[in-house]
From Swiss-Prot:
GO terms for cellular component: ribonucleoprotein complex; ribosome. The keyword NADP does not apply. It holds the Pfam family Ribosomal_L28. GO terms for molecular function: structural constituent of ribosome. One of its GO terms (biological process) is translation. It comes from Mycoplasmoides gallisepticum (strain R(low / passage 15 / clone 2)) (Mycoplasma gallisepticum). The keyword DNA-binding does not apply. Belongs to the bacterial ribosomal protein bL28 family. The lineage of its organism: Bacteria, Bacillati, Mycoplasmatota, Mycoplasmoidales, Mycoplasmoidaceae. InterPro entries: Bacterial_rp_bL28 (IPR050096), Ribosomal_bL28 (IPR026569), Ribosomal_bL28/bL31-like_sf (IPR034704), Ribosomal_bL28_bact-type (IPR001383), Ribosomal_bL28_sf (IPR037147). This is Large ribosomal subunit protein bL28.
């Protein structure tokens, strides 16, 4: 299962952890993905979107 927003295509971000001793290890910041139902002209569609996208969909009144 891909950790990707179905509407915006946004995926996880990569970066580094830094300890107090300044050691570096790679890490990922995953999206807060949720399954929501979106209104379309053909009915409703279930998509996996991030919490940020859900806020935008609510603002545009596109959630079912």
């Amino acid at each position: 299962m891909a950790r990707r927003d179905d509407l915006t295509g946004l995926g996880p971000l990569a970066g580094n952890n830094r300890s107090h001793a300044l050691n570096i290890t790679k890490r990922r910041w995953n999206l807060n993905l949720q399954k929501v139902k979106v209104k379309t002209d053909r009915g409703t569609l279930t998509v996996k979107v991030s919490a940020r996208t859900i806020r935008t969909l609510r603002k545009l009144d596109l959630l079912a």
